[in-house]
Structures are given as C-alpha cells and as structure tokens.
Amino acid sequence: MANKYYPTIGLEIHAELKTQTKMFCACKNDSDEEKPNVNICPVCMAHPGALPVINKKAIENVIKVGLAVNGTIADFSEFDRKNYFYPDIPKGYQISQYKFPIVSGGHLADMDITRIHLEEDTANNKHDRGKYALIDFNRSGVPLMELVTEPHTFESVEVATKTATNFAKEFQLILWYLGASEANMEKGEMRVEANVSVSTDKNTKSKNYVEIKNLNSFRSVEKAVKYEIERMTELLKDGKEKEIVRETRGWDEGKQKTFSQRKKEGSADYRYFPDPDLPKLKLHEAFDLGKMKEELPELPEAKRTRYRNCFGIKNEDIEVYINDKVLSAWFEEVADLLKVPEKVKLASNYITTDYLGLKKTNLDIRCPSVENFAELINLIFENKISSRTAKDILAMMVKNDASPMKIAQEKNLLQKNDEETLKPIIEKIIKENSEAVVSYKGGKENAIMSLVGKIIKESNGSANPQIVIKLLKEMLE
C-alpha cells in the first residue's frame, strides 16, 4: 500500500509595531522615510557607552495582541542578547527575548500559538548597487513583534496551505483592529516565515524541517508552503530522504520555487544571555491587564458573528466589511437607518457589488451620504425605480452625492407603475414583434422576456417589469 504523507507547518510572523519612536531609543519610527540613515542615533548605531531605554508603548502593543488571541501574559519577562555577526546588526547582537517572552500560548484561526515576544528590527540591506551593498539603518532598532505558532500536522497539502495562509491573514486583521501595526506586507511591516516538514507517520514529526524566510505576501505564503511540501514529498517517494536537510530556504517569486540559502542555526548558535543593560519586566505591576482586556476593540471573529446575527448577509459580503473598517462603519450607519432586514441585505448587495465596482474603476469617487444611500434603497423597495435604474443613479451619486429622488426626477427615471400609461407602449411592441408573440402563444414561455426588454427600452427604462409582465400576459391571452 502506498504511503500517505503528512505535512507539518509552523509559522513565525514578524510585525513592526506602530510606535512614535524606536524600541530602545528616541529615534523616529517611520517606515515611510525614503532618505537613508536619517532616523539614527548613538543607541541604534551601537556607539560605545550608549544605553538602551525600553519603549513602554511597544510592550503595551504586544500585551494587547496577547490578550486578543487569548494568550497568557507573563508575570515576569526580560530581554536577551541574540549573538551573531551580520552587517545589519551594528552591535554584533540583536536584543530579543528567549527564555521569558511577554506572551505564552493562545489560539487563532485553527492554529495554536506558542509565544509572542518582542525584539528590535535589523537594518535594511540594499543589494541593488552593482558590486556594492549599502545599509540603511533607519529600520535598525524599530520595535518588532514575533509570533511563533505550534507545529501543526495536516492530512493534505491543500489543508496545510489554506490553514497557514488563513492564519497569517487573520493575524494581520488582529494587528489592524488593535492599531498595533500597519502590517503592510509590501513594505516589509509584516513578514512571514514558514517551517515545513513532511512525514509518513502522522504522529511523528520529522526533525529535518526547512524554514522559508521573509514571505512578503499571502500568495507567497500559499505558493511557497505548497511548493516545499511537494518537493519534500517527491524526495521521500523517491527514497531520497537524506537530501532533506535542516536548512533555511528562500522563495523565488519569478521561478515560483524555493532555494537553499544556508544551514539552519539552532538556539545554541546564538549564545543567548540576559541583556545586562535592561531591567527585568514585571508586567502585572506595570500594566492593568484587566482594564486592557476590557478596552480591547471588537475583533474580527466577533464582528463576523455580529454581522451574521444582526444583518443576515452573505459570508462573502461579511469578509469585505471585515477587511475595510471605513466601509463597514458606513454600512452599519445605512443599516441603522433602513432597519428592515430585507432592505439591509439589498443595501449590502449594492455596496459590495455596484459601489465597490465603481470604486474599482475610479478611486476618486465620493462615498454617498448615509441618508442618500438609504433613500436609494427605499426607492427600489417602493418600486419607484428599477434595480437597473438604481445602478445608473448610484453612478451619478458617487460624483456629487445628490439625492437619488432628485436625480430620478430630473432624468425622468422614476418607474412607471400606472397600467393605463403602460398599455399603449405594450400594444405598440406587440404589433412590432409578431414572431415573439407567436412563439409565446406556441408555448415558449421565455419569448415573453424579449418583449419585456423591448417595452422597458421603449419606456427609457422607466416601466415596472412586474407590471409589464402582468399586462403582457393579460393582453396576449
């Protein structure tokens, strides 16, 4: 019987924290600064005698994240020196946390969390100057939070990649909702590393795992994890398990494959020891954790549940709102005005399809006022305008936010519901389309819809389709 292969995934996610200053000095924390080496000082440049001072806001942000994922906040924490030599670390060591992280445990999006700790970011190496490599120290010393998950074993590559990607997406949302980080992956404010191994025994994890470094998009996470699982699986199938070694690998976006970078270091290689220049952290004394827990904002999963229960809208629509706090706030105000569940659902459909469709083609369009948008939905429900006309009116509203009723009146778009007004138009179309009439009378029910379309066109879109169908059937009997 053929072996079954079980992938095991663990994630490490780094996120630059949203603070005014760096982790251990008063230099500005500004990821948008384009001029190199301006936000630097003796502390983040490791000048002799320059001593670090802990950024309390950074610790507060990590605690908030820990509370949001139901982690345990440590009574005691401390910073350690992680010793290694690399040009982007001027001190020869990185200030990090090893034995005593700020947060232990927790759970999010089907994955258990091992720990969340705080460290300083490294400088930014520039390798685009030919034979020279340049270093920008603006990022050096920026507060960097690292989340580490437990390794999780999965039944298939599809489940593994989906779970890993969903976790990263959900964690980014948590950071946004808490205001802890901008977590912009394109700018390197959130970086994902995936530890991957494959085994033929579901209960035994392979010791030879690889770490895929610095994945800077969710698509890269999905593609890199999938590729690496499949690469390892093929080696195992071919009896080449010795070629699977514990190493660090990169992801080549162009070639869509991982590549070997270096042998994977162990914690002993870094010779961690407590930083003698920094005090121990007594977190339960320094922070009111109960109050911080109470003051957490509504988080994504709670918001999903509320939207399902209160509005009954589609899951796809809910995810649109979860990922756009401004849009969701606008929708909630519209829903509060409309109140009727059917109207709220219709409003959501127009927002997530028609309004966002318009915005996709023109980023500069205006968001209609809550009152005007609610009025548009009411006009549809009152049969004063058709759904097609509503789309046209909305396209005008995003330009000047005029009243939809005013637009409908000025453009003669109000729906004609008066049967006596519609009958002459219907009679005209019946006379001009004898073939469709014969087809309908011959049993082809769909033939009536071509007549309906012509009648609505003849009325410049103002004829009520339901009334048109009713009258047509009566007049063709």
Please place each PLM-identified region on the residue numbering.
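Core structural elements
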Residues: K187-T200, R308-E333, V344-T361, M397-A402
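M16/insulysin-pitrilysin zinc metalloprotease superfamily fold
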Residues: P341-A347, Y355-C367, E375-I380, K384
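Amphipathic alpha-helical core segments of compact helical bundles
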Residues: K18, N195, E230, S348, ...
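Strongly charged, low-complexity linkers/loops
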Residues: D364-N378, S387-K457
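Amphipathic alpha-helical segments within well-ordered protein domains
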Residues: R304-R308, E332-D336, L356, A374-F381, ...
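Residue-level detector of well-ordered alpha-helical segments, enriched
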Residues: D317, W330, K343-I351, N372, ...
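Short, amphipathic C-terminal "tail helix"
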Residues: E445-E477
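Basic, nucleic-acid-interacting segments
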Residues: M1-E298, N315, L337-V340, T353
